[in-house]
């Protein structure tokens, strides 16, 4: 039993037991993450040793990496066939807010007829406000998007770290109009965002995903400070590793946190969306 009076490592705290990782680049050979099946399987074995029970594979989809749901699903099936362990694997994607995503959204039918996505002020997105309760039946169209979460109601998105996209707010509204919640990956890493912007986004119904590496200082002191503020003030819904290679696992497990931050991170690792 370890004492909460001092900082302890994430590994020693035991909070990874039963955890869900909501952001990773472990699907091999599809983006800038893991390249080989062998490396993917080795990482999964290490995850098992740490007690992680659920993993979302979220490869990039952007103009420079134009993956498709069909291509990723094929690769995902190969990984599932090769993996014999106990971690539950899910396929989603991390979408850059760019022209490629705007085009995909224009081609995507609403997730549910009449699905209502509200912001924290209770305001419905315009396209959904006109739909009735009786129309809320699932669409069965071929997938245009790869949502994240067991209910399939969230789209993991990212932006440039330095500048907001030209159609940032418009794209977020369009995601909501299709019956999804935007889940913003690693908001602490965006240099152009401040606390007021985080508050505005939360009020508009955007949810946040923490990169655990940010708490370890892996992206610098400024990012760590922002991550701790967001964590302490309850902005995050879930957490993820954003793992691109095996070396990052040790960086995460050796991260030392206070009792308060360990408890807050534990909750995020147990959360479902």
Can you name each region flagged by the protein language model?
Residues 20-22, 56-58, 90-93, 183-185, ...:
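Active-site neighborhood of phospho(di)ester-bond hydrolases with catalytic His/Asp-centered motifs
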Residues 48, 176, 231-232:
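Non-catalytic positions within long, well-ordered alpha-helices that form the structural scaffold/packing
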Residues 128, 253-273:
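Mid-to-C-terminal alpha-helical segments outside catalytic/metal-binding sites
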Residues 68-121, 131-132, 136-207:
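Extended substrate/RNA-proximal surfaces in nucleic-acid metabolism proteins
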Residues 31, 61-64, 161-162, 188-190, ...:
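Short histidine/acidic/glycine/proline-rich micro-motifs that form metal-
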Residues 236-251:
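Short acidic/histidine-rich active-site segments
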């Amino acid at each position: 039993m370890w004492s909460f009076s001092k900082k302890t490592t994430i590994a020693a705290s035991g909070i990874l037991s039963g955890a869900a990782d909501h952001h990773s680049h472990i699907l091999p050979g599809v983006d800038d993450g893991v390249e080989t099946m062998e490396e993917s399987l080795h990482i999964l074995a290490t995850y098992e040793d740490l007690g992680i029970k659920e993993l979302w594979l979220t490869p990039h989809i952007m103009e420079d990496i134009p993956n498709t749901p069909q291509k990723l699903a094929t690769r995902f099936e190969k990984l599932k066939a090769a993996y014999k362990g106990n971690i539950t694997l899910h396929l989603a994607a991390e979408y850059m807010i760019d022209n490629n995503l705007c085009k995909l959204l224009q081609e995507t039918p609403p997730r549910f007829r009449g699905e209502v996505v509200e912001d924290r002020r209770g305001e419905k997105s315009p396209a959904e406000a006109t739909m009735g309760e009786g129309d809320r039946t699932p669409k069965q169209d071929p997938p245009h998007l790869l949502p994240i979460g067991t209910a399939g109601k969230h789209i993991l998105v990212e932006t440039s770290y330095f500048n907001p996209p030209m159609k940032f707010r418009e794209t977020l509204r369009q995601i909501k109009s299709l019956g999804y919640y935007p889940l913003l990956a690693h908001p602490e890493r965006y240099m152009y965002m401040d606390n007021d912007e985080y508050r505005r986004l939360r009020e508009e119904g955007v949810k946040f995903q923490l990169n655990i590496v940010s708490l370890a200082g892996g992206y610098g002191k400024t990012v760590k400070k922002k991550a701790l503020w967001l964590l302490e003030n309850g902005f995050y819904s879930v957490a993820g590793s954003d793992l691109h290679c095996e070396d990052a696992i040790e960086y995460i497990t050796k991260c030392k946190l206070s009792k308060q931050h360990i408890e807050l991170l534990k909750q995020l690792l147990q959360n479902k969306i």
